[in-house]
């Protein structure tokens, strides 16, 4: 009994230390300034652009991109398989993924199944592993998204894509394995029809859903994971068992980006469509007041929190916790983000200062793969690979 008490005290002390660390130097810092244009140790580099031709058959749309990125995709798929085999050394789970997963999941909606088949063919990676790579993003996306309105009613959308928590820690360089392997897979995409842009997005090569994007002149959209007991695993299980009346969240965001023609239409679809996993949809428009965070359960919308500059609400911030609840004490990115926005002020919000906010620890952390900045009205869309050199919190 005394031994158990000592273990409990050690665990409690460790948890308290981590909680305190996230809110004290060197794990946090004063709000950064003058970090834009990106440079220095927190800037890994630019993100390449590729065109996805929607006039091509779905099977062929990703051919050019995946020829370039196949080696990097194989690296991350092999890492995921190795992690699975660590827990189930027999290799049976990977065998089921390769042989059974496509049949278990059945037909995917719209063009997505044919697109994944095309990616599998080009990369010589089994279709089941390509499907599991796409499912992966329904479950592990940890992010910070912001929509802010300046004094002139102009909107700016910013997001940090954080990904890879608990998916392998490299003790040699203090980084998350999957986070680092995603950086060379990060791409900017220009989806075109009839040689004209339909929408633009930042994504990971091999993933056919969308996590961050915008429709020039109309709206911007980012997706954050929402942790819930009634979560994505249940939705996927229902899908396998034949209940297919809900959409995969990444497929929904892509469908909205591709087909919606206004902020209100996008908001309506994101609010009402049944989805497989709980999520936060962060949506920005092209005029004053058009910005919101949609908190979703799998079957319904729980909350739509909108900009209202006249009432002093000139920004909305979303991490991975419901806005009416306190964030998990080991993972509070919301408080420092809001603090830095308040210090920036509505008079001074811009691409430059939004990047400053997203560059401040712990909003920037070891999980941060990239930062995206969007100006819908001006048609600006910029994505930058990030690093968080030590001392830096793990999430």
Curated annotation (Swiss-Prot):
Keywords: Disulfide bond, Glycoprotein, Hydrolase, Lipid metabolism, Lysosome, Secreted, Signal, Sphingolipid metabolism, Zymogen
Single annotated GO MF: fatty acid amide hydrolase activity
Catalysed reaction equations from the record: an N-acylsphing-4-enine + H2O = sphing-4-enine + a fatty acid; N-dodecanoylsphing-4-enine + H2O = dodecanoate + sphing-4-enine; N-tetradecanoylsphing-4-enine + H2O = tetradecanoate + sphing-4-enine; N-hexadecanoylsphing-4-enine + H2O = sphing-4-enine + hexadecanoate
GO biological process: cellular response to tumor necrosis factor; ceramide biosynthetic process; ceramide catabolic process; fatty acid metabolic process; keratinocyte differentiation; regulation of programmed necrotic cell death; regulation of steroid biosynthetic process; sphingosine biosynthetic process
Uppermost EC category: hydrolase
Superkingdom of the source species: Eukaryota
Subcellular location: Lysosome; Secreted
Family matches, as InterPro entries: Acid_ceramidase-like, Acid_ceramidase_N, CBAH/NAAA_C
Glycosylation sites: 195, 259, 286, 342
Post-translational changes noted in the entry: N-glycosylated. Proteolytically cleaved into two chains alpha and beta that remain associated via a disulfide bond. Cleavage gives rise to a conformation change that activates the enzyme. The same catalytic Cys residue mediates the autoproteolytic cleavage and subsequent hydrolysis of lipid substrates. The beta chain may undergo an additional C-terminal processing.
Enzyme Commission code(s) on record: 3.5.1.23, 3.5.1.-
Signal peptide interval: 1-21
Cellular component terms per the entry's GO annotation: extracellular space; lysosome; membrane
Disulfide-bonded cysteines: 31-340, 388-392
Residues of the active site: 143 (nucleophile)
Keyword Hydrolase: yes
PANTHER family: ACID AMIDASE, ACID CERAMIDASE
Recorded family membership: Belongs to the acid ceramidase family.
Function: Lysosomal ceramidase that hydrolyzes sphingolipid ceramides into sphingosine and free fatty acids at acidic pH. Ceramides, sphingosine, and its phosphorylated form sphingosine-1-phosphate are bioactive lipids that mediate cellular signaling pathways regulating several biological processes including cell proliferation, apoptosis and differentiation. Has a higher catalytic efficiency towards C12-ceramides versus other ceramides. Also catalyzes the reverse reaction allowing the synthesis of ceramides from fatty acids and sphingosine.
Protein name: Acid ceramidase
Protein source organism: Pan troglodytes
Lineage: Eukaryota, Metazoa, Chordata, Craniata, Vertebrata
Gene: ASAH1
């Amino acid at each position: 009994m005394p031994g158990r008490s000592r273990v409990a005290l050690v665990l409690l002390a460790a948890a308290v230390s981590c909680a305190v660390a996230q809110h004290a130097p060197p794990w946090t810092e004063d709000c950064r300034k003058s970090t834009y244009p990106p440079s220095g140790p927190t800037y890994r580099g630019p993100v390449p652009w590729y065109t996805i031709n929607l006039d091509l058959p779905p099977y062929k749309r990703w051919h050019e991109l995946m020829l370039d990125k196949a080696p990097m995709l194989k690296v991350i798929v092999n890492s995921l398989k190795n992690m699975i085999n660590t827990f189930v050394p027999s290799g049976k789970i990977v065998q089921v993924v390769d042989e059974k997963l496509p049949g278990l999941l059945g037909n995917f909606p719209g063009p997505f199944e044919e697109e994944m088949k095309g990616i599998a063919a080009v990369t010589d990676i089994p279709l089941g592993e390509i499907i599991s790579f796409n499912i992966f993003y329904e479950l592990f996306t940890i992010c910070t998204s912001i929509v802010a309105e300046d004094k002139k009613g102009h909107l700016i959308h910013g997001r940090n894509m954080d990904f890879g928590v608990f998916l392998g820690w490299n003790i040699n360089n203090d980084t998350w394995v999957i986070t680092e392997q995603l950086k060379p897979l990060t791409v900017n995409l220009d989806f075109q029809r009839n040689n004209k842009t339909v929408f633009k997005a930042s994504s990971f090569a091999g993933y056919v859903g969308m996590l961050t994007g915008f429709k020039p002149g109309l709206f911007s959209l980012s997706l954050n994971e929402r942790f819930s007991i009634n979560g994505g695993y249940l939705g996927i299980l229902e899908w396998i068992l034949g209940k297919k009346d809900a959409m995969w969240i990444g497929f929904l965001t892509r469908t909205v980006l591709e087909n919606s023609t206004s902020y209100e239409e996008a908001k309506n679809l994101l609010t009402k469509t049944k989805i497989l996993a709980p999520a936060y949809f962060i949506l920005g428009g092209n005029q004053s007041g058009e910005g919101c965070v949609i908190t979703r359960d799998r079957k319904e919308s729980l909350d739509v929190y909108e900009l209202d500059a006249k009432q002093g609400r000139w920004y909305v911030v979303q991490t991975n916790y419901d806005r009416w609840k306190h964030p998990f004490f080991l993972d509070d990115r919301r408080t420092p983000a809001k603090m830095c926005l308040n210090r920036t002020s509505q008079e001074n919000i811009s691409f430059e200062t939004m990047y400053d906010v997203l560059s401040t620890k712990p909003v920037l952390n070891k999980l941060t793969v990239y930062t995206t900045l969007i100006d819908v009205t001006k048609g600006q869309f910029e994505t930058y690979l990030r690093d968080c050199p030590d001392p830096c919190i793990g999430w």
